[in-house]
Amino acid sequence: MKKSMQWMLATILICGSCVFTSCTNDSKDNPSQPEQSEKTYSASTRELITLVNSHAQLKSLLEKAIAKGTEINPDRETNPAQTLSEYYDFVEWAAHAMPWTVINQPEGTDIFTRIDQSLNLFFFINDIPLEELDGQSLYNNSLQYFEPYRSWLKTFAKAWGAYLDSEDSWNQAYYDIVVKEDTFGISKGWYEDASNWKTFNQFFARKLKSPDVRPIASPEDNSVVVSPADACTQGVWQIDEEGYIVQDEDAGVQVKSKKFSSIAELLGPNSQYRDAFNGGTLTHSFLNVYDYHRYHFPMTGKVKEVNIIEADYAVGGTITWNPKTKKYDLFCDTPGWQSIETRGCVILETPDYGVVALLPIGMMPVTSINWAPEVKVGAEVTKGQELGHFLFGGSDFVILFQSGISFKLKPQLFSHQLMGEELGRLI
């Protein structure tokens, strides 16, 4: 896993016959394509059109972002939405597309790259820097954080999520491709019977067939913290005495304001533990497209608090176009962006290591945090017990330890771990 990860979240398969063409040419260049007034759009696209037509500044900003995107990447194969009407066509298509068909890719491109590039493409325009938005205390000066477009992204995400919850999103052909693509581990015998998967999201949140396929390291020793998910480790950061993540000045810091590196902000307004981790430690791990997307308790303890913090459906990191590789790159290894994303938070009280915060982070485009039924305040839980699951979208998992607790990461930075393997030790 590279430090400047091309991640994406999200997840699988290919439909070679499904090629997006409706927005690769404007109607004036394609007489067979109906004019905008003749087209029938779904509710989420109609909502965007209404917002743009009634909000002059939004229209100006969106048109400017599209124009800048076209200047950066004029290739219509990898940037098909180059006018406002084409953008409407694009989001209409994307809301009913499989994650690997949003962007055209050369024949033979693997599923991981197709999904990664499809999702990065969707947020390429949304993440274009706009000087008009400078100084407005946004995470960055891009359209995805500007109201009312910010709220519309949630509408879009829910529409896409609804499609991926439908039986239209899964069939035998998709399953066959997943089996062929060994990175998803289907052939390893880890997962439940495939007949349980009736939708894409059921596949995405697939269950293990038995706890035995993910043995838990040192189950009786709480000083051994296990990986909460199949994920790539991203590092360990200190939290200062005021509750802010200590950033590496040489790391190309993405956090533009102390607000976004605040642990109190990360834990959300309803937590009683907003200051409990001042002087402590943060570690986080990134779940990739092909990973098992259920997360588990990394330690044994008692649940003290359970919250879901509704926030943005934004990219979080920074997306750039690389003209040499002809690919979109996402940079999201530096922490801080998690505080803008919709996320969950469980506070776990441990016998010997104080309270620990466990935060599954839902990432764009279809953020979804779901708790296991047993996860309730007062519940006694054991290391390796299921905590919850993600549906479609990118995924990250943050763990916070209190001051005075030393955490040493075991695996090499950016290495991949299976859930239950040793993540590190507490001293």
Residue ranges of model-derived segments:
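Bacterial Sec-dependent N-terminal signal peptides
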Residues: 17-37
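Contiguous, well-folded functional domains in the mature portion of proteins
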Residues: 34-427
